[in-house]
Regions:
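Surface-exposed patches in mature extracellular/periplasmic domains of secreted proteins
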Residues: 53-54
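Short, helix-capping/interhelical loops that line the mouth of catalytic, cofactor-
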Residues: 15-27, 71-149, 178-199
Length: 199
């Protein structure tokens, strides 16, 4: 069955929902909070003195990458919460991105970055969990020449979590370079060891 937020027919959202397992605002917010919680645990595991480390030239440092993650919902928050845009036509995306990137690169301590992650994460999740089904189903027109020409708000909002998980994978590899076993791997190893001990 086609996902309700991607359906472009004339049925109402309730009519087109059908017997599927429904994934709505509460689930979006809960899953984002889980992702952000794990990002915070990685940020806590990496020592302050490693926050300036860059895995390669012309890449973000650990601290900059974490600040980027903390800021990643800024664009979608502006589009959906502040302006509630139905089209990106006329939106000055380059200037907005430039301002966000400048904010990301401000010098910060580890504690400041952790607080930034906590604050932005809860602000975003708090917004998402209050959204209606109809709002999530709305289509937003992309800039002219973009493929696809429109996206549902659901897809755009879900993209915030996908973006964070992409960068979290980079951080987990960087942890390995520092000799740190990522916490999710440690937890899995512990579960496997406990299961083996019972067999």
């Amino acid at each position: 069955m086609q996902a309700p937020y991607l359906h472009k027919g004339n049925l109402s959202l309730g009519e087109r929902r059908g017997p599927m397992n429904y994934y709505a605002a509460k689930e979006l917010a809960d899953s984002f909070r889980t992702v952000r919680k794990n990002t915070l645990l990685i940020a806590q595991d990496i020592p302050q003195e490693k926050y300036a480390f860059r895995a390669a030239p012309d890449t973000r440092s650990v601290g900059e990458l974490l600040a980027h993650i903390a800021s990643a919902c800024t664009l979608q928050y502006q589009l959906h919460a502040v302006e509630r845009r139905s089209s990106l036509e006329g939106f000055d995306l380059p200037s907005f991105i430039k301002r966000v990137l400048a904010e990301e690169t401000q010098p910060r301590s580890k504690d400041q970055i952790l607080e930034m992650l906590r604050g932005s994460g809860e602000k975003w999740a708090g917004f998402v969990e209050g959204l209606t089904d109809d709002f999530l189903a709305e289509q937003v027109q992309m800039p002219p020449g973009t493929t696809p020409p429109s996206k549902s708000r659901f897809e755009m909002i879900l993209g915030v979590k996908e973006h964070e998980m992409h960068h979290r994978g980079q951080l987990m590899l960087i942890e390995r370079l520092f000799g740190i076993v990522p916490h999710m791997t440690r937890e899995m190893q512990s579960r496997l060891a406990a299961a083996a001990a019972k067999s």
